[in-house]
Amino acid sequence: MSSTKVLVADANSTDGTREIVLGFRDRLNVSVIPGGMPSVGRNLGAAHAESTYVLFLDADIELAHPSVVRRAVELAQRKQLHCVTTNILCRDGNWIDKLFYAGNDFFQYLSRLHHPFATGMFMLFNLKRFRQLRGFHEQVAFAEDYLLSQQVERKRFGIVRGGVFTTNRRFQKMGHLRVGWLFLKTAMNYWNPNYFLRDHKYWQT
């Protein structure tokens, strides 16, 4: 990992993120860059990339298995994929949280039959294809990962087993019904770019 460039996009956080990240410089080739909303921060990170693939990770996730990154890259290389994602797991949530994430995983597998979607929590992208698609739409504040990944051809999309652990923070803030309704509306509006440009109050709760 010492030769792998790691970029952390920090949107002026006040929780010591920058200091914590830079504390790993003796083990990792890590830098902190200016961030913003998820689309902006991810695009800024990708602009520094020089490798064949770029991996986008949310800061609050944890890999469920240490080999998931390696296997995602191997899958992308073996099948010449443009985008690879993985399953979402909720280790500390209740059964409803886990049920919702299991439903998300089910629809993610199902999406390969129509328009693929990858979670931004873990999204490995072929850098050349990412730039051809012009990256994440920076005027989109919600489901920017869905909007980008659905442009990937079905045969160029893959899901690697292993998963990432996330929290139930979003469910606690918004409630299961609202999160579920937003998910369904997004899936039903995959064809409507104006839907993604609306303010869904996702980051205001």
Where do the protein language model's features map onto the residues?
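Short beta-strand/loop segment that forms part of the nucleotide-sugar
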Residues: S3-N12, I33-G35
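A conserved acidic beta->alpha catalytic loop
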Residues: D10-R18, I61-E62
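Glycine-rich, basic loop-to-helix element that forms the pyrophosphate-binding segment
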Residues: I33-A49
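Short aromatic/hydrophobic "clamp" motif used to bind/position activated sugar donors
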Residues: V54
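Conserved donor NDP-sugar-binding/catalytic core segment of glycosyltransferases
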Residues: P66-I96
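A recurrent flexible, glycine/aromatic-enriched loop bordering the glycosyltransferase active site
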Residues: C83, I88-W95, F106-F125
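Acidic donor-binding loop at a coil-to-helix junction in glycosyltransferase catalytic cores
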Residues: F142-L148
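Hydrophobic helical membrane-anchoring modules
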Residues: E153-T205
